[in-house]
Amino acid sequence: MGLLPTGTGNLLARNLAMVIGDLSKAARIALCGENRAIDVGWALIDDRDEEQAFLVMAGVGFDAAIMAGAPHELKSRLGPLAYFVSGFRALLEPRAGVTLAVDGRIEPCRLVRTIVVGNCGRLLGGLVLLPDARVDDGLLDVVSLGPKSIRGWLVVAARVITRRRHGHRIVQHWQGRTILINSESPQQAQLDGDAIGEVCAMRMRVDRGALLIRVPTAGGSDAAH
């Protein structure tokens, strides 16, 4: 598969060190670049029959509520400010009781704002939410964020900026091949930034090396710097 990343928010392209916004370079990579096998995440929502694929991140809770609360019409009027408006609304919602299972190992029920499961770890602005995530390691990386106050959000921000993974109950990390999230109440969910509505359960697995994608050649001039 070749990528033509024209938008600033193309997180897969950014995680693969692709050039953003230059269609001629992107087309050259798509035609002449190196093949790289990357993992594909699959999510089964509640009792639905079909899995849905994701390549970057899936989320339940606050991050998905931001996506759901910023529809196209609002983004057309406000631009990026739409996400701040949506995020403020989502902050008013209570934390959710969630049970998490990683490779069948059940973690205690916890109150969280959001749980993000990622195949990649890098966000916009160079922030890294999942420091250990690798797009081809056959693992899904998980982070739960459970702040209940402004002070808690400052802890989250500090942990993300410094990429610290251990030592605080508000920000916790795991890795595994299968992830199960069960929420006590319906929560907004998203796959690769697309809101998919409210869910109570999401089961995810990784399909290692399932997708061949064209990337810049090693040492070539088409890589992002």
Name every feature range the model reports, one short phrase each.
Residues 2-113:
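Catalytic core of DAGKc-family lipid kinases
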Residues 10, 121-123, 187:
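Glycine-rich nucleotide phosphate-binding loop and flanking beta-alpha elements
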Residues 12-14, 126-127, 154, 191:
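Short glycine-/acidic-enriched loop or helix-start segments at secondary-structure transitions
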Residues 43-44, 69, 117-118, 143-145, ...:
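Short beta-strand-to-turn element immediately C-terminal to the catalytic PLP-Schiff-base lysine
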Residues 59, 63, 116-130, 195:
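Glycine-rich phosphate/pyrophosphate-binding beta-alpha loops
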Residues 63-66, 108-110, 123-126, 150-153:
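Short acidic/glycine-rich loop or secondary-structure boundary segments that cap or lie
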Residues 74-82, 117, 123-125, 131-152:
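Gly/Ser/Thr-rich active-site loops/lids in small-molecule metabolic enzymes
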Residues 102-109, 134, 140, 144-225:
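ATP/nucleoside-binding phosphotransfer catalytic cores, i.e., glycine-rich phosphate-binding loops
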